[in-house]
C-alpha cells in the first residue's frame, strides 16, 4: 500500500509489468480488430502515411469494460470510415498493459478510467481526455461470500483486486467510507481476471471486480455487498489521446469523437449490425452484454458537454478528477496533487461534434 501509484506507473513504462492475465483472452494476447496477435504493432504499417489513414490507422487500446466494448460496434458498423478516419482496435486483456503501451507511445489513444489519468501528469506524460464513454453505475463492485454482511465484516479477511487500478482506489474508498483502511484487511494483489476465479474457488473472502468478471463472480455464488451504484460518477471511463496527435491532427480526433456519438445513437436504437459487431468483438452473448450495460450510463454528446463543465459534484468531470487526486494523495498512492489537472481535459471535440 505504501508503494506509490507513480512508482507503479513508472515500472509499467519501463516494461517491468508484474500484473498478468486480466480479461477473456490469454495472458499475452492482444486482440486486434477481432484477431489475436502477439505483436502490438500488428504487422508492417506505412509510417510515412498520415496517421488515421487506411495505411496507417490510429491505434486505440481497448480493455474489458461494458462501455468500451461499444467501440467494436463503431468499428464493425463502418462508422469510423464514414467519418473519414481509420482506427485499429487493440484489445488488452490486462488493463494495466494498455496503460504501459499508451505511455510508451505504442498506442495513439486509450480507453482509460479518469482516476488513472491523474498520476501520469506528475511524470510529464502528455495526453488529454477528450471524451467520456460511460460512467459506472453498478459495473464495478465488491463481492463477498456468505457470512459477510457488512464492510466491517471484512476486518481480517482476504480481499483481492488489482494494485494501482481504479478497483484498488474503489476498495480504498469503500473502506474509508466505513471507517477502515487497507490495513484492516488482508489485501491480495491480483489482476481482475485472476481475482474473479480465485473468489469463485473460495481462495479469497472478497474481491473488487469490474465487468464482465463481476457478473461471473456473482453467477459463481458471490454476493454483491457494494457497488458504484452507491457512488455514482466516481468512475468515469474516458478516451485519452496523446497531445501531439491532438495538436497536429485535430481532424482525426474529431472524426473519432464524432464516430463515438454516431455509435451511441445506434447502441441506444439497438441497431442489429452495430450490436452484433459488439457481441462478436467482445465475445459475449446478447444476454450477457445487455446485462452488463445495465451497470453503466453511456454518454452521448449532451451528457459529455454536461460532464466536462465545472461543478461541485461527481456529475462534473473536472470535480471528479480533482476529488480522485485528493483521494489518491490521502491514501499515499500519489505524493503530490498535480498542479495542472485541468490540462488533462480537452472539451473542444465534444463542443465541435457534429
Residue ranges and their predicted role:
Residues 1-55, 352-354:
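Short, low-complexity disordered leader/linker segments with a strong preference
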Residues 29-189, 205-211, 224-227, 233:
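Short, glycine-/small- and polar/acidic-enriched structural segments
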Residues 64, 91-95, 135, 164-168, ...:
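Solvent-exposed, acidic/flexible segments
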Residues 81, 121, 176, 218, ...:
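Short polybasic/polar patches that bind polyanions
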Residues 115-116, 187-188, 194-283:
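Pocket-lining segment of extracytoplasmic ligand-binding domains
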Residues 248-333:
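Secondary-structure end/capping motifs
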Residues 321-354:
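Conserved C-terminal helix/tail region of periplasmic/extracytoplasmic solute-binding proteins
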Amino acid at each position: 500500500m505504501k508503494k506509490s501509484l507513480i512508482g507503479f506507473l513508472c515500472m509499467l513504462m519501463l516494461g517491468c509489468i508484474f500484473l498478468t492475465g486480466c480479461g477473456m483472452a490469454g495472458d499475452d494476447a492482444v486482440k486486434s480488430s477481432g484477431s489475436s496477435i502477439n505483436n502490438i504493432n500488428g504487422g508492417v504499417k506505412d509510417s510515412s502515411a498520415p496517421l488515421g489513414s487506411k495505411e496507417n490507422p490510429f491505434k486505440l487500446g481497448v480493455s474489458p469494460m461494458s462501455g468500451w466494448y461499444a467501440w467494436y460496434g463503431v468499428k464493425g458498423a463502418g462508422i469510423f470510415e464514414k467519418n473519414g478516419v481509420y482506427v485499429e482496435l487493440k484489445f488488452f486483456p490486462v488493463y494495466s498493459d494498455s496503460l504501459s503501451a499508451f505511455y510508451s507511445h505504442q498506442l495513439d489513444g486509450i480507453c482509460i478510467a479518469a482516476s488513472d489519468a491523474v498520476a501520469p501528469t506528475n511524470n510529464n506524460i502528455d495526453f488529454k481526455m477528450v471524451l467520456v464513454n460511460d460512467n459506472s453505475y453498478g459495473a464495478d463492485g465488491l463481492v463477498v461470500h456468505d457470512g459477510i454482511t457488512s464492510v466491517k465484516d471484512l476486518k481480517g479477511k482476504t480481499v483481492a483486486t488489482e494494485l494501482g487500478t481504479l478497483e484498488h482506489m474503489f476498495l480504498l474508498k469503500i473502506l474509508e467510507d466505513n471507517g477502515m483502511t487497507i490495513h484492516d484487511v488482508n489485501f491480495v494483489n491480483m489482476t481482475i481476471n485472476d481475482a474473479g476465479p480465485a473468489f469463485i474457488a473460495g481462495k479469497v473472502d472478497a474481491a473488487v471486480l469490474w465487468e464482465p468478471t463481476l457478473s461471473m463472480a456473482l453467477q459463481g455464488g458471490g454476493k454483491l455487498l457494494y457497488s458504484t451504484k452507491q457512488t455514482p460518477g466516481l468512475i468515469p471511463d474516458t478516451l485519452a489521446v496523446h497531445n501531439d496527435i491532438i495538436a497536429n491532427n485535430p481532424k482525426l480526433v474529431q472524426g473519432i469523437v464524432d464516430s463515438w456519438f454516431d455509435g451511441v445513437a445506434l447502441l441506444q436504437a439497438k441497431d442489429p449490425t452495430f450490436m452484433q459487431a459488439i457481441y462478436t468483438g467482445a465475445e459475449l452473448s446478447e444476454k450477457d452484454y445487455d446485462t452488463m450495460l445495465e451497470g453503466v450510463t453511456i454518454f452521448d454528446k449532451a451528457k459529455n458537454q454536461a460532464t466536462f463543465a465545472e461543478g461541485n459534484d461527481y456529475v462534473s468531470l473536472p470535480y471528479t478528477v480533482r476529488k480522485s487526486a485528493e483521494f489518491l494523495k490521502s491514501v499515499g498512492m500519489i505524493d503530490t496533487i498535480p498542479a495542472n489537472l485541468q490540462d488533462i481535459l480537452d472539451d473542444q471535440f465534444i463542443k465541435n461534434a457534429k
